[in-house]
Swiss-Prot record:
This is Biotin synthase. One of its GO terms (biological process) is biotin biosynthetic process. The lineage of its organism: Bacteria, Pseudomonadati, Campylobacterota, Epsilonproteobacteria, Campylobacterales. Keywords: 2Fe-2S, 4Fe-4S, Biotin biosynthesis, Iron, Iron-sulfur, Metal-binding, S-adenosyl-L-methionine, Transferase. SUPFAM superfamilies: Radical SAM enzymes. One of its GO terms (molecular function) is biotin synthase activity. Its cofactor is [4Fe-4S] cluster; [2Fe-2S] cluster. Catalyzes the conversion of dethiobiotin (DTB) to biotin by the insertion of a sulfur atom into dethiobiotin via a radical-based mechanism. It is an enzyme of class 2 (transferase). CDD domains: Radical_SAM. [2Fe-2S] cluster binds at C61, C96, C154, R221. Residues 1-228 form the Radical SAM core domain. The gene is bioB. It comes from Helicobacter pylori (strain Shi470). Binds 1 [4Fe-4S] cluster. The cluster is coordinated with 3 cysteines and an exchangeable S-adenosyl-L-methionine. SMART domains: BATS, Elp3.
């Protein structure tokens, strides 16, 4: 039976981001109806970590909004990492905090963070069409810094931003050059507050994207993330094909600003596809 890894997300700093990423409701350039807060209370984060681990999550990603890591964010993420690791939950801790230099990433590594998530999002050529406040090259350099720091790299992208198939191939080729251990695959969902005007990908096109990702990243853990609930809706037959086509990890629970599937029901559905839940990241 195929083994599936479950990963979960905690949005520990939300909203008020000065970047203008056209796909993100956390940008202050868009008027997204989201919760905004500076730093989530440590006790709340610990409760989330315990609850999600009990449900079977092996990965736990601490996400902060904003362009990049700074001293305050570094100290906060380090504090959370130490507190979670003291619980001895056996969670693989991931930080996702934007652009970061080598010294910052080494600091997080030493504090107990195991991997760093920084998505390329799309191709180098298409990126300027969805963001003008930072460059694709900055993203790529941060990924390289994570690897140099001895952290695991989690890096992927978004499909359905009006990019071409050539852009998808270019992004996947760039990701392959980084050899990430995990690649999140997101499907863009249209939102009236965001400037990207496009129709949601069909389930068939989304499956083609997964097949393409598997071709370029045969050894990466391909993790289906945002958009799964909308693209596949109640189409169990096509959702099950995700795992036939290469997906072997799933985001369990909510995303940054949108609701995910109810964890227990999601796990029941995954089991009904003949999948088993991994009990170790290794």
């Amino acid at each position: 039976m195929q083994e599936i890894f479950l990963c979960s997300i905690s949005n520990v700093r939300s909203g008020d981001c000065k970047e203008d990423c056209a796909y993100c409701t956390q940008s202050s350039h868009h008027q997204g109806a989201i919760k905004r807060y500076k730093f989530k209370d440590e006790k709340v984060v610990l409760q989330e970590a315990r609850a999600l681990r009990e449900l079977g999550a092996l990965g736990f990603c601490l996400v902060t909004s904003g362009r990049e890591l700074d001293d305050e964010k570094c100290e906060y993420i380090a504090k959370l990492a130490k507190a979670i690791n003291q619980e001895e939950l056996g969670l693989h801790l991931i930080a996702c905090c934007g652009r970061a230099d080598l010294e910052q990433l080494e600091f997080l590594r030493d504090a107990g963070i195991h991997s760093y998530n920084h998505n390329l999002e799309t191709s180098q050529n298409f990126f300027p069409k969805i963001c003008s406040t930072h460059t694709w090259e900055e993203r790529f350099i941060t990924c390289e810094n994570a690897l140099r720091a001895g952290l695991g790299l989690c890096s992927g992208g978004i499909f359905g931003l009006n990019e071409s198939w050539e852009d998808r191939i270019e992004m996947l080729r760039a990701l392959a050059s980084l050899s990430p251990h995990t690649t999140p695959i997101n499907f863009f969902i249209k939102n009236p507050v965001l400037p990207i005007d496009t129709e949601t990908l069909s389930a068939d096109e989304a499956l083609e994207c997964v097949l393409l990702a598997k071709e370029f990243l045969p050894n990466a853990r391909l993790m289906v993330a945002g958009g799964r609930e909308v693209v596949f809706k109640d189409n169990d037959k096509k959702e099950a094909k995700l795992f036939e086509y290469g997906i072997n990890a799933v985001v369990l629970g909510d995303y940054l600003t949108t609701k995910g599937k109810a964890p227990k029901k999601d796990i029941e559905k995954l089991l009904s596809y003949g999948l088993t839940m991994a009990t170790s990241c290794h």
